[in-house]
From Swiss-Prot:
InterPro entries: EFTu-like_2 (IPR004161), EFTU-type (IPR029459), P-loop_NTPase (IPR027417), Small_GTP-bd (IPR005225), T_Tr_GTP-bd_dom (IPR000795), TF_aIF-2_arc (IPR004544), TIF_IF2 (IPR015760), TIF_IF2_dom3 (IPR023115). GTP binds at residues 23-30, 87-91, 141-144. Keywords: GTP-binding, Initiation factor, Nucleotide-binding, Protein biosynthesis. SUPFAM superfamilies: Initiation factor IF2/eIF5b, domain 3, P-loop containing nucleoside triphosphate hydrolases, Translation proteins. It comes from Aeropyrum pernix (strain ATCC 700893 / DSM 11879 / JCM 9820 / NBRC 100138 / K1). This is Probable translation initiation factor IF-2. One of its GO terms (cellular component) is cytoplasm. Residues 23-30 are annotated as: G1. PANTHER family: EUKARYOTIC TRANSLATION INITIATION FACTOR 5B, TRANSLATION INITIATION FACTOR IF-2-RELATED. Disulfide bonds: none annotated. Function in general translation initiation by promoting the binding of the formylmethionine-tRNA to ribosomes. Seems to function along with eIF-2.
Length: 617
């Protein structure tokens, strides 16, 4: 048998809370989990830890022993049998701990580097936790990195902080205050755990060092206390058939395809009928073996040994061997059934649940492919929060048909006609089709980075599109004919000029300071090199074709302007003002004043529209 039932068979028991660790890359998630395990092993005379598949149970008596120095400050008398920590930290694993309407995880530790503060994945973790309605505390990690910190290995935080210099305590206070501020901005009140009177109203911040072990006693004490106080109903153990979620699908010598699962409710027994989600629909099979790690070993090792058990009780991490598991999808629900009839009903429920996550519509939207149901759900949720519609969401490699779907969208909306591939391969024929159809494929193994890359691309594409639209207009330019640099007087006039503001380009019409049109710029040269444009400060030669005769219509030293049409001026001021330089705007104001004095009716209409717009704003 495996899993702690937590009491006699006749009573309503509490199971272990399932705890997951989240946070930004390199903020110390894995180190913290390792430290918790090592701290528990060090207290082995009280029972050590129980290793599960993908999880470790720290028993209640071990937590009480570790937290013993705090008994006067944080009295810890546990009624839960312990804490089940999911061994693999991170958002992708948390995403797979999914159940309909929430998460299998009962509680989370959000790890924040106290010196670095909030980072992109910290915000993503907050979004995920809010979306799945999972309570959490913050482990403000790496307190040993605070300048001047004097480490006290494995000491409680309330003891080690008293031994620090006032300046060090001041820095810690400041860093904690910054975390409180970021949480407030996210709409979540938080405070240092020692100052909280009602833990239902504020999220606890526990300063720790995963490296030295400082603060770990408080972290475990607060975590255990919070879960058993506020999650008691959720943690009530049910004796019925098991409910769980698939974390991983893998091959195992002697057993073929097996699944690693977390059982969060009920009992799973050898020979039970189980229903689990597959690529082509629900799979019904019978448990052949339940496998747990042999004690005193690192189960992450390839040589790890396993023992068979007859049953497991929630909460537990277990490896399940059964026929027909090849097509199981990670992140899918797994249910035990007491009869064939119940299995049929569960098949319908599993099918409905998977169809909600794997879908194809005729709507305009991005194509999303992911490796598991959990990451697919998390990715689609994250996109929807950002207002990005999804046309297709599915599991598995990117295929040619996925690219064709994106190509259909691209014709209508080029910013949505893309494929977002999370942790999956792109098939060669899909690569070829994407190249042919001009469909962009984004690939990443971190959800936040995948969305960030896509959003950055959209931003750049839209900026490029706006710049293209701006450059289709005649833009403001001001230049002076340099004395002594008249190379040809007319047809076309060729003169040396200095650009005094804005931009001049071939094709732009030219006017004088009275608003009279003189011709059109044919070419701009710097020595023998043709230029596409010249800006403020440039000294270049220009050729002007039209009714201009140097000496009659314009003279050496005269200032000329580009002749910006009224509608172009309006667009520049209303749509592209952020893309043009200050000197260009100054030149446009001069041009508008020249046009006003020349009684240009079109310009006067534009000026009136702009005035009305400013007043209405």
């Amino acid at each position: 048998m495996a899993g702690d039932k937590g009491g006699g068979d006749g009573e309503r028991r509490l199971r272990q809370p399932i705890v997951v660790v989240l946070g930004h890359v390199d903020h110390g998630k894995t180190t913290l989990l390792d430290k918790i395990r090592r701290t528990a092993v060090a207290a082995k005379e009280a029972g050590g830890i129980t290793q599960h598949i993908g999880a470790s149970i720290v028993p209640a008596d071990v937590i009480e022993k570790i937290a013993e120095p705090l008994k006067k400050v944080i009295p810890v008398k546990l009624v839960i049998p312990g804490l089940l920590f999911i061994d693999t930290p991170g958002h992708e694993l948390f995403s797979n701990l999914r159940r309909r309407g929430g998460s299998v995880a009962d509680f989370a530790i959000l790890v924040v580097d106290i010196m670095e503060g909030f980072k992109p994945q910290t915000y993503e973790a907050l979004e995920l936790l809010k979306e799945r309605r999972v309570p959490f505390l913050i482990a403000a990690n790496k307190i040993d990195r605070i300048p001047g910190w004097k480490p006290n290995p494995d000491a409680p935080f309330i003891e080690t902080i008293r031994r620090q210099d006032p300046k060090v305590r001041e820095i810690l206070e400041q860093r904690v205050y910054e975390i409180v501020g970021k949480m407030y901005e996210a709409g979540l009140p938080a405070e240092l755990f020692t100052r909280i009177k009602d833990f239902r109203r504020k999220i606890a911040i526990v300063p720790v060092s995963a490296r030295t072990g400082e603060g770990i006693p408080e972290l475990l004490a607060v975590l255990a206390g919070l879960t058993q106080t506020y999650l008691k109903e959720r943690l009530r153990y049910a004796e019925g058939p098991a409910k769980g979620v698939v974390l991983e699908v893998k091959e195992m010598q002697g057993f073929g395809t097996v699944v690693d699962a977390v059982i969060y409710d009920g009992v799973l027994k050898k020979e039970d009928i189980i229903v689990v989600g597959g690529r082509e629909g629900p799979i019904v099979t019978r448990v052949r073996a339940l496998l747990m790690p042999a004690p005193l070993q690192d189960i992450r090792s390839r040589e790890a040994r396993f023992v068979q058990v007859d049953r497991v009780y929630a909460a537990a991490g277990v490896r399940i061997a059964a026929p027909g598991l090849d097509d199981v999808i990670a992140g899918s629900p797994i249910y035990a059934a007491e009869s064939e009839e119940e299995a049929r009903k569960l098949m319908e429920a599993v099918q409905r649940e998977i169809e909600e996550l794997r879908f194809r519509t005729e709507n305009i939207g991005v194509v999303v492919k992911a490796d598991t149901l959990g990451t697919l759900e998390a990715l689609v949720e994250a996109l929807r929060r950002r207002g990005v519609p999804v046309r297709l969401a599915d599991i598995g490699p990117v295929s040619r048909s996925d690219v064709l779907d994106a190509a259909v969208t691209r014709k209508i909306d080029p910013y949505l006609g893309v494929v977002l591939a999370f942790n999956v391969k792109v098939l060669p024929e899909a690569e070829e089709e994407a190249s042919r159809a001009g469909v962009k494929i984004f690939r990443e193994s971190m959800i936040y980075k995948l969305i960030e890359d896509y959003e950055e691309w959209v931003k750049k594409e839209k900026e490029a599109e706006r710049l293209k639209a701006l450059n289709s207009l005649i833009r403001p330019g001001k230049f002076r004919i340099l004395p002594g640099y008249v190379f040809r007087r007319s047809d076309p006039a060729i003169v040396g000029v200095e650009v005094l503001g804005g931009v001049i380009r071939p094709g732009y019409p030219v006017m004088d300071s009275q608003g009279r049109e003189l011709g059109r710029i044919m070419a701009i040269k710097d020595r023998d090199r043709s230029l596409e444009e010249a800006r403020l400060g440039a000294a270049v030669a220009v050729s002007i074709q039209g009714r201009i005769l140097i000496g009659r219509h314009a003279n050496e030293g005269d200032i000329l302007y580009t002749n910006v049409p009224a509608q172009h001026a309006y667009k520049i001021l209303t749509e592209f003002k952020d893309l043009v330089s200050k000197d260009e705007l100054d030149v446009l104001r001069e041009i508008a004043e020249i046009k006003r004095r020349a009684a240009d009716h079109e310009y006067n209409k534009v000026l009136l529209r702009l005035k009305i717009k400013r007043v209405s704003q």
